């Protein structure tokens, strides 16, 4: 149990925040924010274990599920939503659950975070399985909703991860893979949407991005599995094909159209000079990983 919560402590550097000029306040806030990536850096050993396990479970058909309340919950929903266009994931593969439901994304839902049972019900509603990875996010490390979610996930046999911004957090005792990032007291006392929220966003960026790299949705540093939902992303898709295959934009567009807007298939077609059907077969035989499919010379 936590005896002292640093996320609720007063920050000595901002005791006179209300007396600072705008520029002084900005300089102070920026200086405090600079501590965040350094704090996250210290958690890389733990995050490495989390991501390796997440990759393994994802390859087995498991899902990545974020669960949290308030700012923590919103950040989980945001990261999950961004994975759909970025990595062409199914909306049901990476899920963000927030206490109080979708209404809580824009409005405070009073008391939602205080109910452990509510998290259990939310996880039951998505048919949680032992293959899934549940990441409980709570700056304080003691949010009842997150405690309830992680506890229930453990009973199902799911992989459980906790992300908190306090040492000796309650959720760290529940999760199989605890991650604690000490960002120190907030600029505005107790406002964990600030440094704590920034740390959580950086961590979720790492988890989702590196996991997707690990399951073959990235070629070099390109979004090879991008889902083109607008003109900007269509253009990006074509330029990715153009870049990898070293061809003209028009040639890349032709491949993109023949492949029925599948960047992976189009890339293998262009690199190997083969048909859509053959490119699809090679990807299927090589775990949907483009570099392996390109190297595959089997008839």
UniProtKB/Swiss-Prot annotation:
Residues at the catalytic site: 82, 113
GO molecular function, one term: ether hydrolase activity
Source organism, top-level taxon: Bacteria
The entry's keywords: Carbohydrate metabolism, Lyase
Pathway: Amino-sugar metabolism; N-acetylmuramate degradation
Chain ranges passing through the membrane: none
PROSITE patterns: GCKR, SIS
Note: A lyase-type mechanism (elimination/hydration) is suggested for the cleavage of the lactyl ether bond of MurNAc 6-phosphate, with the formation of an alpha,beta-unsaturated aldehyde intermediate with (E)-stereochemistry, followed by the syn addition of water to give product.
Family listed: Belongs to the GCKR-like family. MurNAc-6-P etherase subfamily.
Name assigned to this protein: N-acetylmuramic acid 6-phosphate etherase
Species annotation: Staphylococcus aureus (strain bovine RF122 / ET3-1)
Gene name as annotated: murQ
């Amino acid at each position: 149990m936590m005896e002292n919560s640093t996320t609720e402590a007063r920050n000595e550097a901002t005791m006179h925040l209300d007396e600072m000029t705008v520029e002084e306040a900005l300089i102070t806030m920026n200086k405090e924010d600079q501590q965040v990536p350094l704090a996250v850096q210290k958690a890389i050993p733990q995050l490495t274990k989390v991501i390796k396990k997440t990759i393994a479970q994802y390859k087995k058909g498991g899902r990545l599920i974020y669960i949290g309340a308030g700012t923590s919950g919103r950040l989980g929903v945001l990261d999950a939503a961004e994975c759909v266009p970025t990595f062409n994931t199914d909306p049901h593969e990476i899920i963000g659950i927030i206490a109080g439901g979708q209404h809580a994304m824009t409005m405070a839902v009073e008391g939602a975070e205080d109910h452990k049972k509510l998290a259990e019900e939310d996880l039951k509603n998505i048919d949680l399985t032992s293959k899934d990875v549940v990441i409980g996010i709570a700056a304080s490390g003691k949010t009842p909703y997150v405690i309830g979610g992680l506890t229930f996930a453990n009973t199902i046999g799911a992989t459980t991860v906790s992300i908190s911004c306090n040492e000796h957090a309650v959720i760290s005792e529940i999760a199989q893979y605890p991650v604690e990032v000490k960002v120190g007291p907030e600029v505005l006392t107790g406002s964990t949407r600030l440094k704590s929220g920034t740390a959580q966003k950086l961590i979720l960026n790492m988890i989702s991005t590196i996991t997707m790299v690990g399951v073959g949705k990235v070629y070099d540093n390109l979004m090879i599995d991008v889902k083109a939902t607008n003109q900007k992303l269509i253009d990006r898709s074509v330029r990715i094909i153009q870049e990898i295959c070293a061809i003209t934009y028009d040639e890349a567009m032709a491949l993109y159209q023949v492949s029925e807007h599948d960047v992976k298939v189009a890339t293998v077609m262009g690199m190997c000079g083969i048909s859509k059907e053959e490119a699809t077969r090679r990807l299927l035989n090589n775990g949907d990983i483009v570099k392996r499919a390109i190297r595959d010379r089997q008839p």
